[in-house]
């Protein structure tokens, strides 16, 4: 998605875009599996230290970290240290402004590995899911709640077009 957008925006061929290194903005509270993505896909991790008082990243920090090479922002719903939720709605609002101002298409992935089966049942939470315009995908882990083998997890995309043709497989 990003490479096609970047090529079109900068009048480049697909081959010319291959040398560009995209980045993902996220909290330093990320799960270790993200390291594999960064290494295997040659993506620069733009890591934000969470606030020492809330242990969440702030929308202003995200705004300062994104640029035209940003392929996404990861918001964590239930970090591994204290279970805190990043302020997805606030980050979505900041990205709305940035995307409109700069003609970017930065989306949000909600890493709800730890909070994905808790947050939907909390009535007092601000929107954090597909109700927000920039949330493109949400992941959750089944193995954290028992009843499944280690490593069981799911990811759901809002729209088929946001899932890379290299990832989707029809059987």
At which residue positions do the language-model features occur?
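PLP-dependent aspartate aminotransferase-fold enzymes
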Residues: 1-75, 89-93
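Short His-Asn-centered micro-motif
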Residues: 26-28, 76, 110, 140-142
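Active-site-proximal loop/turn and secondary-structure-junction residues that shape catalytic pockets
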Residues: 30, 79-81, 112-116, 144
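Short acidic, glycine/serine/threonine-rich loops at helix termini
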Residues: 36-40, 84-87, 118-123, 149-152
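C-terminal, well-structured subdomains that either form a transmembrane helix-short loop-helix hairpin
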Residues: 71, 75, 80, 84, ...
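Catalytic PLP-binding core of fold-type I/II PLP enzymes
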Residues: 85-123
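Active-site C-terminal subdomain of aminotransferase-like
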Residues: 121-124, 128-171
């Amino acid at each position: 998605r990003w490479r096609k957008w970047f090529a079109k925006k900068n009048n480049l061929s697909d081959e010319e875009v291959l040398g560009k290194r995209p980045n993902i903005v996220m909290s330093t509270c990320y799960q270790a599996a993200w390291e594999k993505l960064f290494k295997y896909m040659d993506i620069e991790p733009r890591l934000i230290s969470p606030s020492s008082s809330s242990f969440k990243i702030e929308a202003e920090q995200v705004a300062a970290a994104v640029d035209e090479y940003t392929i996404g922002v990861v918001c964590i719903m239930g970090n591994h240290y204290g279970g805190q939720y990043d302020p997805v709605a606030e980050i979505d609002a900041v990205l709305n402004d940035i995307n409109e101002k700069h003609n970017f298409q930065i989306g949000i992935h909600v890493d709800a590995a730890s909070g994905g089966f808790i947050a939907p049942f909390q009535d007092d939470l601000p929107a954090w899911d597909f109700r927000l315009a920039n949330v493109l995908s949400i992941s959750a882990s089944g193995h954290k709640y028992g009843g499944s083998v280690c490593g069981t997890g799911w990811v759901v995309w809002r729209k088929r077009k946001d899932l890379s043709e290299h990832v989707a497989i029809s059987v």
